[in-house]
């Protein structure tokens, strides 16, 4: 039976009030893991250790499993404790009518985001920035300026303000509203000081409530040519605050960036099971959120990193499959274990850049060094490496990419527990001139040399 109209966030809200009742524990501990395991077995999914898939039949099975996961499970609303279900026709309608390209930024600083494919020769868009990492108020502008000064960086992804006027931006307080507005205003001023006043940004990152996110659209702040973030919850869940934010974004004609980081070793389970959920999450982004693009980020439950062997496989297979069977535009976000000014951090980011570029990602978003949890431990140098490696990887044969990745990951994967803490932005850069130290330049050159020895040609 055909659908009455295309599904949107208002339909989601209505169904979230009347859907099947379910406890969150049943959803997290029973429905998600059992269905993911069932679908892995049904379709015989086995990635055989590949980072980027070469078996198109297996990719098709993965797509069917992800589609079926979304169709049969639906999405859990954490506020009403009900399940929102979609029809098969509604899902296909969303897939068949995705936003196939869009522009981020304005003027000469604008960039066109267009579909890429597995092994594409075109370099992906580099969205450089702290990626939600906490940044001190006194260095908020220079930190973001360090990214805008990098020509490899096309757009900025915001950091989190730890304070505004010296006060904590507590959710649903006036300070959260002020921080949400100030965050992007400061970043756009930083871009202008770098000579790139039209750069697009992605945020807001500081605010945690709907009122904070909505207030970021303001004079001097977020505009419709910026990526506006809304986050799904782990796994296949959402709250009604997010649905209200989506309604605002749609009504404002904003570029919508739907974000979610599936957890390897979490509710979904292993590599193939988590990838099934990841594919379902991509599809849900364009259905529930009317997303312009989906920001992925498979993360390891133990190490808190997106750069492990397992999470890179999940990211590579999910993106390649989405790219092969849909026109959904996809990005990935970067959370290395190691901190800035360390070779390990740069090698971790490089492994993910290689994976994302080869698997067809449209946007690379990072780098949140030191797992994105330590204040001021993120700089523009990590984004430079992300961009240079993407440029070197574009067009390389997938078989060669898989060999390089296997060797590269083996260089750092035994060091997660003892990953070097690295240095803060203030220790990595001259804050006044916003230039990296000689020490960081030498570390960077050392990491680059190792990548060249593995076969990358810069």
UniProtKB/Swiss-Prot annotation:
The Gene Ontology biological process annotation of the record reads:
methanogenesis; methylation
Q: Which reaction does it catalyse?
A: Co(I)-[methylamine-specific corrinoid protein] + methylamine + H(+) = methyl-Co(III)-[methylamine-specific corrinoid protein] + NH4(+)
Which family does this protein fall into?
Answer: Belongs to the monomethylamine methyltransferase family.
What InterPro entries would the database entry show? MtmB_MeTrfase (IPR008031), MtmB_sf (IPR036655)
Name the enzyme group at the top EC level: transferase
Oligomer status and interactors? Dimer of homotrimers. Can form a complex with MtmC (MtmC1 or MtmC2).
Record's miscellaneous remark: MtmB1 transcript is abundant relative to the mtmB2 transcript.
**Keyword entries, A-Z:** Methanogenesis, Methyltransferase, Pyrrolysine, Transferase
Q: So which domain of life are we looking at?
A: Archaea
Q: Name one GO molecular function term.
A: monomethylamine methyltransferase activity
Q: EC?
A: 2.1.1.248
Q: Which pathway is recorded for this entry?
A: One-carbon metabolism; methanogenesis from methylamine
Q: What is this protein called?
A: Monomethylamine methyltransferase MtmB1
| SUPFAM superfamilies given in the database record | Monomethylamine methyltransferase MtmB
- Summary of the function given for this chain in its UniProt record: Catalyzes the transfer of the methyl group from monomethylamine to the corrinoid cofactor of MtmC (MtmC1 or MtmC2).
The organism is: Methanosarcina barkeri
